[in-house]
From Swiss-Prot:
Phosphorylated in response to activation of rasG. Gene3D superfamilies: 3.30.530.20. Keywords: Coiled coil, Cytoplasm, Golgi apparatus, Lipid-binding, Phosphoprotein, Transport. Catalyzes the transfer of PtdIns and phosphatidylcholine between membranes. Residues 238-264 form a coiled coil. Belongs to the PtdIns transfer protein family. PI transfer class I subfamily. Residues 151-174 are annotated as: Disordered. It comes from Dictyostelium discoideum (Social amoeba). GO terms for molecular function: phosphatidylcholine binding; phosphatidylcholine transporter activity; phosphatidylinositol binding; phosphatidylinositol transfer activity. This is Phosphatidylinositol transfer protein 1. InterPro entries: PI_transfer, PI_transfer_N, START-like_dom_sf.
Length: 264
């Protein structure tokens, strides 16, 4: 089992990020869904529990060709999907990913907390002494170059983008966190991964953590660079955008079946 806390620093207020995160999740889901692969939203509704209340979502990720060949070799094509259940009681959020095929052999949990600070809270998740010893910490600076140059887009580079609506940016690499002219917040994302599969555990767990680093980096660069698209939106505006996106995703996932039918 691996436990890693990713700390993502952003030039936003915690309330601004609430809107920006939801908008960007919906937009990226739409961008990454086509021809039967991508995100299927089954449920998106309010929930209420004794400890938390917020928005509950249930999604299916149809992965298909998006996984490396060595992982696809482990499981049949019918099992190339992940089930995600998320409880967004902002500023606390919990996401659980499961593989219907792997069952109890695969555990993937993300717990997110958000604070108006500059990466200074050392145990925001209230971990035990044992958990703290097992946890590693990785700070993500959205201005640092992404690992794979092929994935670089100037329109998603915070050092190139200025938000006219928010009057922020472009961000100067590394030095922007010292600015007193912008708000500073941190997303503290605690990721727990366990893959109980003899001979592959270490490789898969490290692979998943690497994927999360890349996803968190890319996503939060987008959140900032799309500021002028979502800045000023209300929660009602975001929920309407999510609803429209849900319908669009359904159509895109149906494209593969329609294409197959046309080929017969």
């Amino acid at each position: 089992m691996l436990i890693r806390e990713f700390r993502v620093v952003l030039p936003l207020t915690v309330e601004e990020y609430r809107v920006g995160q939801l908008y960007s999740v919906a937009k990226t889901s739409s961008q990454e869904t086509s021809n039967g692969e991508g995100v299927e939203v089954l449920v998106n509704e309010p929930y209420k529990e004794p400890e938390h209340e917020g928005q509950y979502t249930h999604k299916i990720y149809h992965l298909g060709s998006r996984l490396p060949g060595w992982i696809r070799a482990l499981i049949p094509s019918s099992a190339l999907k992940l089930e995600e259940k998320a409880w967004n009681a902002y500023p606390y959020c919990k996401t659980v990913l499961k593989s219907p095929f792997l069952g109890e052999k695969f555990t993937f949990i993300i717990e997110s907390r958000h604070a108006q600070d500059n990466c200074k809270t050392e145990n925001i998740h209230n971990l035990s002494e044992k958990e703290l010893k097992e946890r590693t910490v990785e700070v993500i600076d959205i201005t640092k170059p992404i690992k794979d140059p092929k994935n670089y887009k100037e329109t998603e580079d915070p050092t190139k983008i200025r938000s006219e609506k928010a009057n922020r940016g472009p961000l100067e690499e590394e030095k922007w966190r010292e600015s007193t002219e912008m708000p500073i917040m941190t997303c503290y994302k605690l990721v727990t991964v366990e893959f109980k599969y003899f001979g592959f555990q270490t490789k898969v767990e490290n692979f998943m953590m690497g994927i999360e680093f890349d996803l968190f980096t890319k996503f939060h660069r987008q959140v900032y660079c799309w500021l002028d698209e979502w800045f000023g939106m209300s929660m009602d505006d975001v929920r309407a955008f999510e609803l429209k996106t849900k319908e669009d995703l359904k159509k895109k996932l149906e494209e593969k079946d329609e294409n197959k039918a046309a080929e017969k």
